[in-house]
């Protein structure tokens, strides 16, 4: 007896940041046939890349069973990590870049891998701000979330005596 086929779900994601770092927001739109679920959140002090990753993580975590997922993003950072082998290289080098520096956002990359594990995920690039309806929708919600976080500005960065590695 064959197992039942996985449900095919579309996941549209976006992240936004007012300043980089600054207040940020993320949004994920899940679609299964006529059913939709919009998820969103924000952080007071973050980066645009962290919000892009958070959107994908939260969208995948919301799925209640293993699915075939078409993930649509306007983030080259997110898509290329998988489609151009960046992530595989980072892991082989012990979470270091080709230049030997620690990979930024490792905590979220690891969380994303865990969230992806039960699913089959295909990444699709959508050019942002070109009228793609779902991308525009998650962009608006991510920006709204970022603006709602703007009441708490990022603390100033402490001066350092050393060059930063990351």
From Swiss-Prot:
**In this protein, which residues make up the domain named RNase H type-1?**
5-147
Leader sequence residues? none
Q: Specify which residues bind Mg(2+) 2 according to the UniProt entry for this protein.
A: 14, 139
Q: Supply the alphabetized keyword list.
A: Endonuclease, Hydrolase, Magnesium, Metal-binding, Nuclease
Q: Which cofactors are named for this entry?
A: Mg(2+)
Catalysed reaction(s)? Endonucleolytic cleavage to 5'-phosphomonoester
**Record-level GO BP terms:** DNA replication, removal of RNA primer
| Transferase listed as a keyword | no
Annotated cofactor note: Binds 1 Mg(2+) ion per subunit. May bind a second metal ion at a regulatory site, or after substrate binding.
What CDD domains would the database entry show?
RNase_HI_prokaryote_like
Q: Where is this region: Disordered?
A: 128-166
Q: What is its EC number?
A: 3.1.26.4
PROSITE patterns under this entry? RNASE_H_1
For the keyword Manganese, the answer is no
Gene Ontology MF terms? magnesium ion binding; nucleic acid binding; RNA-DNA hybrid ribonuclease activity
Positions annotated to bind Mg(2+) 1: 14, 52, 74
Q: How does it assemble?
A: Monomer.
* Role, per record: Endonuclease that specifically degrades the RNA of RNA-DNA hybrids.
Give the matching PANTHER family: RIBONUCLEASE H1 (PTHR10642:SF26)
The entry's family comment says: Belongs to the RNase H family.
- Which protein, by its recorded name, is this? Ribonuclease H
Name the gene behind this protein. Answer: rnhA
């Amino acid at each position: 007896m064959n197992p039942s086929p996985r449900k095919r779900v579309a996941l549209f994601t976006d992240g936004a940041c007012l300043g980089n770092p600054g207040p940020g927001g993320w949004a994920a739109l899940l679609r299964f046939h006529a059913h939709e679920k919009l998820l969103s959140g924000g952080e007071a002090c973050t980066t645009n890349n962290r919000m892009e990753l958070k959107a994908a993580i939260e969208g995948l975590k919301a799925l209640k069973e293993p699915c075939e997922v078409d993930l649509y993003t306007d983030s080259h950072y997110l898509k290329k990590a998988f489609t151009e082998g960046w992530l595989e290289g980072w892991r082989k080098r012990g979470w270091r870049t080709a230049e030997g520096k620690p990979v930024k956002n490792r905590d979220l990359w690891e969380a994303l891998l865990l969230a992806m594990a039960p699913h089959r995920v295909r990444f699709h690039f959508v050019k942002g701000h070109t009228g793609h309806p779902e991308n525009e929708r998650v962009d608006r919600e991510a920006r709204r979330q970022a603006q709602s976080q703007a009441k708490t500005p990022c603390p100033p960065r402490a001066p350092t005596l050393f060059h930063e590695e990351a």
